[in-house]
């Protein structure tokens, strides 16, 4: 007797999505409150998610890992048709929007790393600009923070 392959469920419970995606059910509800994902309600008023939500949650997790704010993720999702399953080509276009920001962050982190050798332990990254060693710090007149590292 031949076994039939189990048919994939069209709709998933929040618990199933949480288990498959590795995020808490509360995170799913939060993402939904921010408009990043959508659910439908069954006759018992319980949330159910279409299977494509797994891909969207994966994208959210990736974007958050690289520091992309949820609002930016939402803007990117906003240009996609609702209920649309993202293709590899569309993912490439979507991720390219974030690449420039990621490159800028990498550049800043590399600059910070390279300046650490000059740190004297006071939290400042440059002895020549340190207000303790250089009370007349000219950069301080232009504002607070890492003035040499910030892009204006």
UniProtKB/Swiss-Prot annotation:
Molecular function GO terms recorded: 2 iron, 2 sulfur cluster binding; DNA binding; DNA-binding transcription factor activity; metal ion binding
GO biological process: regulation of DNA-templated transcription; response to oxidative stress
SUPFAM superfamilies referenced in this protein's UniProt entry, alphabetically: Putative DNA-binding domain
Gene3D superfamilies assigned: 1.10.1660.10
Might be part of a sensor region: region residues: 119-130
Pfam families the UniProt entry points to: MerR, MerR-DNA-bind
Keyword DNA-binding: yes
Transmembrane segments: none
DNA-binding region(s), residue ranges: 14-33
Sequence positions that bind [2Fe-2S] cluster: 119, 122, 124, 130
Residue span(s) of domain HTH merR-type: 11-79
UniProtKB keywords: 2Fe-2S, Activator, DNA-binding, Iron, Iron-sulfur, Metal-binding, Transcription, Transcription regulation
Metal-binding in keyword set: yes
Entry function: Activates the transcription of the soxS gene which itself controls the superoxide response regulon. SoxR contains a 2Fe-2S iron-sulfur cluster that may act as a redox sensor system that recognizes superoxide. The variable redox state of the Fe-S cluster is employed in vivo to modulate the transcriptional activity of SoxR in response to specific types of oxidative stress.
PANTHER family in the record: REDOX-CYCLING DRUG-SENSING TRANSCRIPTIONAL ACTIVATOR SOXR, REDOX-SENSITIVE TRANSCRIPTIONAL ACTIVATOR SOXR
Subunit structure: Homodimer.
Designated name of the protein: Redox-sensitive transcriptional activator SoxR
Species name: Salmonella typhimurium (strain LT2 / SGSC1412 / ATCC 700720)
């Amino acid at each position: 007797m031949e076994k039939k392959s189990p048919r994939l469920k069209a709709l998933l419970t929040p618990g199933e999505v949480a288990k498959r995606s590795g995020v808490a059910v509360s995170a799913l509800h939060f993402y939904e409150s921010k408009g990043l994902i959508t659910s439908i309600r069954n006759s018992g008023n319980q949330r159910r998610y279409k299977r494509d939500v797994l891909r969207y949650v994966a994208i959210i997790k990736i974007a958050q890992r690289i520091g992309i704010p949820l609002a930016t993720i939402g803007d990117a999702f906003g240009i996609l048709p609702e209920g649309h399953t993202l293709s590899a080509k569309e993912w490439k276009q979507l991720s390219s929007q974030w690449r420039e920001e990621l490159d800028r962050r990498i550049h800043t982190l590399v600059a910070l790393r390279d300046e650490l050798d000059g740190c004297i332990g006071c939290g400042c990254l440059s002895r020549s600009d340190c207000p303790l060693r250089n009370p007349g710090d000219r950069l301080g007149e232009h504002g607070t923070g890492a003035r040499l590292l910030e892009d204006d």
